[in-house]
């Protein structure tokens, strides 16, 4: 792909596998020439002259390849699935709005990379650039949009970082341990489960009534991670999930180089839960796969090394139970004092 200055940028996609001549496309949002070669496996090899254009192009092309998948995740992230599937999506929508990130967005984005905010904003701009194209020319929309009589919504950085909802499940373990503590002592639990490193304090807060733990406390939390119940999709039996990975030292390999084995247990789906891409720009030269709706490469390699992504049984979440004021349900007890809850009104459209 190539870009030229003067308001619009020329994105020249060279599809060697599909045609004998290069295709050129003008895009607003990039500042220098970007080249893209799509290989025989459908993988985009993107080469840009700066970081912004690189991730803009990644977002644009990923949305072009996976637009309906993007729309489903946007609805999951924003709590708008009930407008698509009716009451079956209501609990998921309530959970998504309950768990929405509401703190310092800039700090959160830059936590992932020193330039995280700029990278994610460039990626989102690329996604939205393609969505705007489909609004001008609905013929570009995948058939699912016509079938469901919907159009894709625009993305925000908040939608991108909400993907963490798909890779966390520690709160369920927290609740299971708490329930077990109501019947056996902490030492017995430590003999059944492996805690590393250190010795965790498994004692329940004395103010917690064990009977509270019997309730379905995580109903909304779990609903956020469930698939959107589209009747048009084949309902396959759920298989147990898990992941594993290991590294073999170069001292034990014939080549003398280490070997990384990364095995995230993701179900086979269509479209795939992975998206392959090659990203090249000053300071960047990586190839591999990752979540389709997230910029960068989470499982891949560069000239210097390889990396992977799996979900460990890590202590990544904390579960708190608060006592409510019996005389005012909008107050909770904190440090022996009643505190007012921040009330946020949400409206959920149901089909």
Regions found by a protein language model. Give the residues of each.
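N-terminal secretory signal peptides that target proteins for export/translocation
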Residues: 1-3
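Bacterial N-terminal signal peptides
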Residues: 7-16
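Short secondary-structure boundary/capping segments
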Residues: 148, 155-169, 274-279, 313-316, ...
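Short Pro/Gly-enriched beta-strand edge/turn motifs at strand-loop
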Residues: 227-233, 274-283, 326-333
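A conserved hydrophobic secondary-structure block that centers on an alpha-helix together
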Residues: 237-239, 267, 272-288
């Amino acid at each position: 792909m190539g870009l030229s200055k003067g308001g619009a940028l020329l994105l020249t996609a060279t599809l060697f596998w599909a045609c004998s001549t290069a295709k050129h496309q003008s895009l607003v949002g990039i500042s220098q020439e970007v080249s893209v070669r799509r290989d025989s496996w459908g993988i985009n090899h993107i080469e840009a002259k700066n970081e912004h254009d690189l991730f803009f192009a990644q977002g644009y092309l990923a949305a072009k390849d996976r637009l309906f998948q993007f729309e489903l995740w946007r609805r999951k992230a924003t709590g708008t699935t009930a407008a698509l599937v009716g009451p079956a999506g209501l609990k998921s929508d309530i959970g998504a709005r309950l768990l929405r990130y509401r703190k310092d967005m800039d700090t959160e984005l830059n936590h992932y990379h020193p330039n995280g905010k700029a990278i994610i904003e460039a990626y989102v701009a690329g996604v939205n650039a393609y969505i705007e194209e489909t609004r001008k020319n609905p013929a570009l929309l995948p058939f699912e949009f016509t079938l469901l009589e919907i159009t894709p919504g625009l993305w925000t950085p908040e939608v991108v970082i909400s993907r963490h909802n798909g890779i966390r499940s520690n709160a369920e373990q927290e609740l299971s341990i708490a329930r077990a503590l109501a019947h056996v002592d902490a030492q017995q639990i430590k003999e059944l489960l492996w805690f590393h490193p250190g010795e965790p304090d498994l004692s329940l807060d004395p103010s917690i009534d064990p009977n509270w733990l019997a309730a379905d406390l995580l109903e909304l939390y779990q609903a956020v991670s469930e698939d959107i119940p589209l009747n048009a999709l084949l309902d396959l039996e759920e298989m147990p999930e898990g992941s594993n990975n290991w590294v073999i030292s170069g001292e034990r390999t014939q080549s003398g180089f280490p070997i990384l084995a990364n095995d995230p247990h993701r179900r086979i789906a269509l479209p795939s839960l992975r998206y392959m891409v090659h990203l090249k720009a000053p300071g960047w030269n990586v190839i591999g796969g990752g979540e389709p709706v997230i910029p960068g490469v989470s499982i891949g390699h560069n000239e210097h090394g390889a990396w992977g992504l799996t979900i460990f049984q890590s202590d990544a979440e904390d579960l708190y139970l608060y006592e409510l004021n019996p005389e005012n349900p909008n107050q909770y007890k904190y440090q022996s004092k009643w505190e007012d809850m921040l009330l946020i009104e949400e409206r959920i459209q149901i089909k």
